[in-house]
Amino acid sequence: MKQKYSKKSKKWIYITTIIFILILDISSKRLIIKYIKTYDTKKIFSVLNFFHVHNHGAAFSFLSDQNGWQKWFLSTVSMLTILVMTRIITKLKKQETKKITAYSLIIAGATGNLIDRIFYGFVVDFIDIHINDWHFATFNIADCSIFIGIIILMRINYST
């Protein structure tokens, strides 16, 4: 039996996903700013720290060593991403909920990091996963949202 999806359910998935991720992302960053000084670390588990750092670049601190132009460039890229992905969602069929969710996750992550760039001039990163002395790049909830959205899209595109 086919499920029925209304236009409202498509919007509901889209809006709820974005709002949930934004609340989680913004709240977590505010707590980090409030309770952990920049470059300080709080051990959470043996493989997880909260390490408060300001990223002036993109993923893996790409472009962070530039003289400030990257803030505007990355903000523009984020805005274009948000607009293009929103347009894609409006063109998707109502029953394409996995794609709608994936694009919504990417939009939410891009929006969360864009908000940081606008208000702080950098992105607040704090999730530090490590094994002994090896540390993965520090990231945040918005980055996780973007990553998960991309993985979902890749699975959809490579499984069909």
Swiss-Prot record:
Its main location: membrane. GO terms for cellular component: plasma membrane. GO terms for biological process: proteolysis. Keywords: Aspartyl protease, Cell inner membrane, Cell membrane, Hydrolase, Membrane, Protease, Transmembrane, Transmembrane helix. It is an enzyme of class 3 (hydrolase). Its EC number is 3.4.23.36. It catalyses: Release of signal peptides from bacterial membrane prolipoproteins. Hydrolyzes -Xaa-Yaa-Zaa-|-(S,diacylglyceryl)Cys-, in which Xaa is hydrophobic (preferably Leu), and Yaa (Ala or Ser) and Zaa (Gly or Ala) have small, neutral side chains. The keyword NADP does not apply. The chain crosses the membrane at residues 13-33, 72-92, 104-124, 134-154. It is found in: Cell inner membrane. It comes from the Bacteria. It is a multi-pass membrane protein. Pathway: Protein modification; lipoprotein biosynthesis (signal peptide cleavage). One of its GO terms (molecular function) is aspartic-type endopeptidase activity. The active site is at D125, D143. NCBIfam families: lspA (TIGR00077). Belongs to the peptidase A8 family. This is Lipoprotein signal peptidase. It comes from Buchnera aphidicola subsp. Acyrthosiphon pisum (strain 5A). The lineage of its organism: Bacteria, Pseudomonadati, Pseudomonadota, Gammaproteobacteria, Enterobacterales.
